[in-house]
Amino acid sequence: MTSSVDSRMADALLDDFLAFTLTGSAPSATDGACAAGAVRWQWLGDGLLALEPAAAEAADTARASVLVSAGVHGDETAPIELLSMLVRDLASGALPLACRLLVVLGNVPAMRAGERYLDDDLNRLFSGRHAQVPDSREAPRATQLEAAAAAFFAAAPAGAARWHIDMHTAIRASVFEQFALLPHTGMPPTRTMFEWLGDAQIAAVLLHTAKGNTYSHFTAEHCGALACTLELGKVRPFGQNDLTRFAPADRAVRKLVSGATGEADVPLPRVFTVIDQITKQSDALELFVAADVANFTAFARGTVLAQDGDYRYTVTHDEERIVFPNPSVKPGLRAGLLVIDTTRETVAALV
């Protein structure tokens, strides 16, 4: 029999998943029902919550499995707040749940500290790369998040849709305020994903051309998920976000988990494909762009963008755009991506 203490802790967990997680509490009962019995929930650990419809239906075999994550960088607060509100509305019954759902708050210790990360960028430690930094405080969390995603998708109905939406905000401004990054899988992007991104009013999509170590790369490659990383605006402290700026993406996530149909004939995002990157060779790296240059700023052929000892990066296409320029990364890491517009050919090849 559930005690009143268990019930109060469950209410606190579900009513404000963010606040509950920041306290470091663990619920005395780790599973239960909510939404007037319509939803089952299970607490899987710090910042990890699974929810699914309680009623067994014939449609269960086609029920989608959706992982929605935020806070992989601990200071990217707006998506974390949106995800906590999503849990609240599902638990209260204000929003129906039509899928298996795994909610993930990523780097919880960094969230508590108000930092991007403590030792290492968590979003570069997936697909086993955490084994290279065993002393990092982020390494155990990467291991835990990989295991949680793998177990969640392993239990998915065969043939049913699998999604992973990883929500972030960016350090710097962007020519396209809200954009998405799709992991490289060796297959053309899907029209299903592009139409969902269009419904979310995502202005641009960046296509990776090599495997990476991000959370969405992991779930796409190892779990077979339709996965994307969303960049939804600027980093701000908890409580200082204008969440109305995130409304289209929030609505699209809510449609996905509630089984609602997206808007028809939405404009598809522009598409940019990675053609090179600036890799920091040493602490002597010079990036010849303004410190506050916006993501997707364009540069003409012949422009020298970086120099590091004998290494120099010069624009070789008529126009290249820089994304995520960051000269302060550790040597050996990416200090910027270079992309070109490939909208026409990408949209023509959608599957």
Swiss-Prot record:
GO terms for molecular function: hydrolase activity, acting on ester bonds; succinylglutamate desuccinylase activity; zinc ion binding. Pfam families: AstE_AspA_cat (PF24827), AstE_AspA_hybrid (PF04952). It comes from the Bacteria. Keywords: Arginine metabolism, Hydrolase, Metal-binding, Zinc. Its cofactor is Zn(2+). GO terms for biological process: arginine catabolic process to glutamate; arginine catabolic process to succinate. Zn(2+) binds at H73, E76, H168. It is an enzyme of class 3 (hydrolase). Binds 1 zinc ion per subunit. The active site is at E231. Its EC number is 3.5.1.96. CDD domains: M14_ASTE. Pathway: Amino-acid degradation; L-arginine degradation via AST pathway; L-glutamate and succinate from L-arginine: step 5/5. It catalyses: N-succinyl-L-glutamate + H2O = L-glutamate + succinate. PANTHER family: ASPARTOACYLASE, SUCCINYLGLUTAMATE DESUCCINYLASE. Belongs to the AspA/AstE family. Succinylglutamate desuccinylase subfamily. Transforms N(2)-succinylglutamate into succinate and glutamate. This is Succinylglutamate desuccinylase. The lineage of its organism: Bacteria, Pseudomonadati, Pseudomonadota, Betaproteobacteria, Burkholderiales.
